[in-house]
């Protein structure tokens, strides 16, 4: 049986893993075995956190909108319901940006939301 030498392949694989682990602390960047484990774990974290980031940003936008609408004596849920009834389709990210940077237009959205809510209440009373 022929003698198989695979030093080149193993070295290339180790080099690739150690290159990915560059910047890690201690043995995690120097030894192949721990570097490989660290890279696998880092991949799991990044996969999870790409999904969590979407949740965190949505939570942040809702918090900002809630704080802005409560200054105008309306709750977040009523504000969003009023926008839906007024047929205004603006996503939470844009509402958050408007609340921070363009308060005048955000107040007009609050007003139209309140108007839609009062028209719903008037229809219920009839």
UniProtKB/Swiss-Prot annotation:
Keywords, A to Z, come to: Ribonucleoprotein, Ribosomal protein, RNA-binding, rRNA-binding
Q: Which InterPro entries match?
A: Ribosomal_bL20, RIBOSOMAL_L20_CS, Ribosomal_protein_bL20_C
Q: Name one GO cellular component term.
A: ribonucleoprotein complex
Q: Which GO terms describe its biological process?
A: ribosomal large subunit assembly; translation
Write one Pfam family the protein is assigned to.
Ribosomal_L20
Q: Which GO terms describe its molecular function?
A: rRNA binding; structural constituent of ribosome
Give the source's domain of life in one word.
Bacteria
Alphabetized HAMAP family for the sequence: Ribosomal_bL20
Q: Which family does it belong to?
A: Belongs to the bacterial ribosomal protein bL20 family.
- Which PANTHER family does the record cross-reference, listed alphabetically? 39S RIBOSOMAL PROTEIN L20 (PTHR10986)
Question: Which NCBIfam families does the entry mention?
Answer: rplT_bact
Q: What is its biological role?
A: Binds directly to 23S ribosomal RNA and is necessary for the in vitro assembly process of the 50S ribosomal subunit. It is not involved in the protein synthesizing functions of that subunit.
Identify this protein by name: Large ribosomal subunit protein bL20
Q: Which gene encodes it?
A: rplT
């Amino acid at each position: 049986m022929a003698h198989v030498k695979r030093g080149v392949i193993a070295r290339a694989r180790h080099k690739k893993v150690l290159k990915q682990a560059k910047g890690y602390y201690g043995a995690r960047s120097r030894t192949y075995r721990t570097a490989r484990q660290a890279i696998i774990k880092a991949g799991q974290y990044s996969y999870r956190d790409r999904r969590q980031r979407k949740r965190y940003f949505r939570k942040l936008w809702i918090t900002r909108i809630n704080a802005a609408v409560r200054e105008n004596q309306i709750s977040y849920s009523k504000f969003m319901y009023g926008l839906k009834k007024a047929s205004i389709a603006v996503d939470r990210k844009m509402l958050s940006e408007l609340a921070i940077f363009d308060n005048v237009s955000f107040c007009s959205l609050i007003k139209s939301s309140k108007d839609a809510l009062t028209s719903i209440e008037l229809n219920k009373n009839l």
